[in-house]
Amino acid sequence: MTKFPKETNMEGLKELALSLLYLDIQKTKFSPMVVSHPFTNNGITAQIVNGEVKTLNIFENKDDLNTWRKGMEDIINKTDKPYSLYFLINKPYALVFVKFAMPYLSQKDFSSLLSDAWTRTEMPSNDSNFKPSEFIKLFKSADKRFLMETDELQQYEELPDTVTVYRGVKSDRPNKVLQLSWTLDPDKAEWFAKRFDEDGVVYEATIDKKNILALFSRRDESEIIVDLDYLRDLTEYEIPSEDMSQVQ
């Protein structure tokens, strides 16, 4: 059982953020315009310096990088709420930030931030920084009252004791079926299977409600987060022929 502080430790969060700020800027194939870093994906950015807007090339110019970091330090040190600090984080790094911020967060704040980070991230199950078991541990540590929005929690509470779930994967990646993210909607699973105009496969399985870690409907995906150890009756779902005829 994870032990959370009663109140979020903002000083601890700020120290974490400052350590992330000084990580190296990572090159991408679109650099110098696009980079990878916990606080930005822009290699060319603008910042107010001495009352004037200045263009900074933080990828190629060390002085510009130092200027940008000093400005970000000031912003970080002035934040007084966990959400204000969290929203400074570059979206691809949101889940990693929540993972390392966990020791400083109250359970309420942790649950809320985990929920937002998961639903903001494109294909979070594929994040190479996490094993499925790590995600399961994070979700099990969360309080469902703050992990889900009010309507989502109500939908979760109304689920039957045993639930049928679906997942769409590319036909050449059947191993990807063993992930946390499933859906209640077979049509949505089919969409994910076909989203890149490739042949895909939809799987169905059953799971007891007590082993469902979260339900997220905010992206219109009827997403179900499951504890993989308790999935059963995994089979390939036969897509109805009338649906297949609509796939171009």
How should these model regions be labeled?
Residues M1-T164, S171-L180, P186-Q248:
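Conserved NAD+-utilizing ADP-ribose enzyme module
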